[in-house]
Amino acid sequence: MKDVVGSPGTWSGMALRLSQCVSAGASMGAMATAYGFSNYTAFCYLIASMGLQLLWSFGLACLDVYSLKTKRDLHNPVLVSLFVVGDWVTAILSFAAASASAGVTILFERDVHFCRMYPQLSCGRYALSVVLAFITWSFIATSAVSMFWLLPSL
């Protein structure tokens, strides 16, 4: 059971963590370069959540690289328990931030038509950042489920 896809110390685990880093960084970059994002709390929360996700995933990707390089086994019950809790916490935060930002973006574009009334708002970048945040969440959810699946077998 220790050969679960995405488990720590494997190539698939490292690829999953690096995918999380790239998509979280891209989401942060898209939102940070959008005009007026700091006026809306949901967008600031998205930046903070993706920043936390980036740090968490980068740290675990570095741990995966170290494990692959030194041939160390990371399938320790204490370590995997920490990974499970961290993955689930960051997954919930990422999903909440992406959902809140998606709600504000839809409100601006479809309900109150802020994007037409105020063309200086970067509604396209808001939407791009939200899509990237949901992609990040899908990667972290995959990782959280694989860690949770691995835990009982240790």
From Swiss-Prot:
InterPro entries linked to this entry: CASP_dom (IPR006702), CASPL-5 (IPR045009)
Principal subcellular localization: membrane
Similarity-based family: Belongs to the Casparian strip membrane proteins (CASP) family.
Domain of life: Eukaryota
GO cellular component terms attached to this protein's record: membrane; plasma membrane
Keywords from the UniProt entry: Cell membrane, Glycoprotein, Membrane, Transmembrane, Transmembrane helix
Glycosylation sites: N39
Localization of this protein: Cell membrane
Segments on the Extracellular face: 38-42, 99-129
Membrane-side (Cytoplasmic) residue stretches: 1-14, 64-77, 151-154
Subunit annotation: Homodimer and heterodimers.
Membrane topology: Multi-pass membrane protein
Protein name: CASP-like protein 5B3
Stretches that traverse the bilayer: 15-37, 43-63, 78-98, 130-150
PANTHER family to which the protein is assigned, alphabetical: CASP-LIKE PROTEIN 5B3
